[in-house]
Amino acid sequence: MSLDIDQIALHQLIKRDEQNLELVLRESLLEPNATVVEMMAELHRVYSAKSKAYGLFNEESELAQALRLQRQGEEEFLAFSRAATGRLRDELAKYPFAEGGIVLFCQYRYLAVEYLLVAVLNNLSSMRVNEELDIRSTHYLDINHADIVARIDLTEWETNPESTRYLTFLKGRVGRKVADFFMDFLGASEGLNAKAQNRGLLQAVDDFAADAQLDKSERQNVRQQVYAYCNEQLQAGEEIELESLSKELAGVSEKSFQEFTAAQGYELEESFPADRSTLRQLTKFAGSGGGLTINFDAMLLGERVFWDPATDTLTIKGTPPNLRDQLQRRTSGGN
């Protein structure tokens, strides 16, 4: 992995009681030795693999103003990180769920792009076996479960300040209040809505297939083509490119997919991040609620799975063997 650390600083927030978060600030930057580089490479990998929301700085963002001064050489990176950690402590202290953690600021390069990554990591205890086969306690950074993380694409921010996607952050599992506090600290608001872009793509694909007057099998083949392309982009960490996708669908219609989406006004970006959960709808139907979870391949609709919208009834012909076995055992037992 071609990751080069420019500057990295660690600080700590310690929760002493319900009211106070103690601030512990380093007096110097971390030396980017092999261990530190390995840690950042792992954090970069874990973060890149997670679903993210996109945002941009508000005009009054204190962090953005301080970062701009640091980038212009008017403030040292260590001083910037120390002041930012103080603001983070003040913001976090407003919330009853406030917990401590290791606060990390890292400015690094990856594939010719400069980033600033900000994270609050948990420092956990565990056990290890030493060379004498004795058990000893140890501490480690819980990188795999890091959920308070944001990353600023410094290259995008500085070359295209009107962008709505140079800032990314984790959203969802940690809860709304946690996301709110971190966005307040960053002085940022949500920008590009990747899920909405992916939903728009799915609708455009279905409309494109209908416009081309494809039969059911051909429509499903088109969806499978789109899914294969998008999933390949997702696995490679690349964005969905409308021009490239249009080339994949070149034989579907006389008009290109890109021309079709522009003419119909879907308002899709020329490129946008793939959203795994939304794209899955191209090949599967899934839903849950009221104690029921259903998931089946889209191609089975109308063949083995039938839906009657008038009665909202789903009929399944031929149940999976393991489900059938459970049903038979339960009914034969009289329960």
Swiss-Prot record:
Query: What PANTHER family would the database entry show?
Result: NUCLEOID-ASSOCIATED PROTEIN YEJK, PTHR38772
State the name under which the record lists this protein: Nucleoid-associated protein KPK_1538
Instruction: Tell me the superkingdom of the source.
Output: Bacteria
- Return the NCBIfam families for the record: PRK00378.1
Any single Gene Ontology cellular-component annotation: cytoplasm
Please report which protein family the annotation says this sequence is part of. Answer: Belongs to the YejK family.
- Offer an example of a GO molecular function term for this protein: single-stranded RNA binding
Its annotated compartments are: Cytoplasm, Nucleoid
Do you know which Pfam families this protein is assigned to?
Answer: NA37
Q: InterPro entries from the entry?
A: Nucleoid_associated_NdpA
Write out the entry's keywords from A to Z. Answer: Cytoplasm
Keyword hit for Secreted: no
